[in-house]
């Protein structure tokens, strides 16, 4: 099983690495890959960078998608490359999940239409 963690500038470290730590406990049952619009370094809101293994154009097929939240969600709401990637890949994955404000991106991509979802209360109106 392959999990893709999708990163963007100013993502929240805990929103990404908390779940990844838990999934990592599955050992060989899961392969975790990191993805961003472009492969390479992606800055977190706290400063430390994560290295994206893949860009949107060369990311492998994914069984699971994890989208962290963070203040960087706001500019990503207007990023068509991000929204298209999420729409396209969520249709092929078994599970697409988000943490906190990451759900705003899933909603903007139309992936939460007709579904109940939670987010940070500051994002209710987005």
Regions found by a protein language model. Name each.
Residues 1-96, 104-108, 114, 124:
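Extended, subdomain-level signal for the structured scaffold at the beginning of enzyme domains
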Residues 117:
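Anionic-ligand binding patches
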Residues 120-121:
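Class I SAM-dependent methyltransferase SAM-binding "motif I" and its flanking Rossmann-like core
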């Amino acid at each position: 099983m392959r999990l893709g963690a999708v990163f963007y500038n100013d993502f929240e470290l805990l929103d990404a690495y908390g779940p990844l730590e838990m999934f990592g406990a599955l050992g060989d049952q899961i392969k975790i890959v990191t993805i961003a619009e472009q492969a390479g370094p992606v800055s977190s809101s706290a400063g430390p960078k994560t290295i994206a293994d893949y860009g949107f154009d060369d990311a492998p097929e994914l069984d699971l998608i994890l989208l962290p939240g963070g203040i960087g969600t706001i500019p990503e709401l207007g990023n068509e490359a991000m929204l298209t990637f999420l729409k396209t890949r969520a249709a092929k994955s078994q599970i697409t999940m988000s943490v906190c404000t990451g759900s705003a991106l899933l909603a903007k991509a139309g992936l939460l239409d007709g579904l109940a979802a939670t987010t940070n209360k500051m994002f209710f109106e987005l």
